[in-house]
Amino acid sequence: IKDATPEKLYILNSNPIINQWTYTGGLSLKKLIRDGFINLALSRNSFDNHIDRYEDNELKLPSQQTLAYQSRETENKFRLDVNLNKKGWKIAYGAVIQLAEYENNTFNVLRKELRDINNNIIQPAVTVNFSSPLKNFWRYGAFAQISKRFSDNRMGISAGIRSDMNSFTTDGNNGLQTLSPRIALSYVLADQWTLNASVGRYYKIPPYTILGFAD
């Protein structure tokens, strides 16, 4: 590194080398029906993440690598929703299903091995080294929402419910256990003042990095 200083070298070698890429693609089909429309969507998104760190991030010697993290998250989604407008009531309901794919290979040196002048180990190395055991699994759910405005559009009310299930967790197929109801109210007090209130309960499956961790 040009004009290297201890501070610059420390920053260079303490920060990992990160290489990421992502893509999203899909298509949708909309069909008009009486009082609304049906929307059908198919999509795929993927996120690839590589993180490496060496004792010397410029030389990048394999024998000096202290962190090697490679992961990829891919979701293939199919969504169907129906949207209606009847007598001022906006109604939406539908279902979604997706195939989740996750890969993770992790090597991390938490503590290096230390030896004395006689080559005896005085501090054993501590490392994390695993390949994620998480297999491809399904995620699916259904939802419904209804909303309307009253009093010359000054007051609005919205209510909804959804359930998210999966084929991975122990109780993942129990839709009643993952119900997420919510309700929201809004009232226009003046041109620039609106009072909002909402309450709900939300269920969310842990991220793939947690689901795919191995000790």
Residue spans of the language-model regions?
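Face-selective signature of the C-terminal outer-membrane beta-barrel domain
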Residues: 1, 18-172
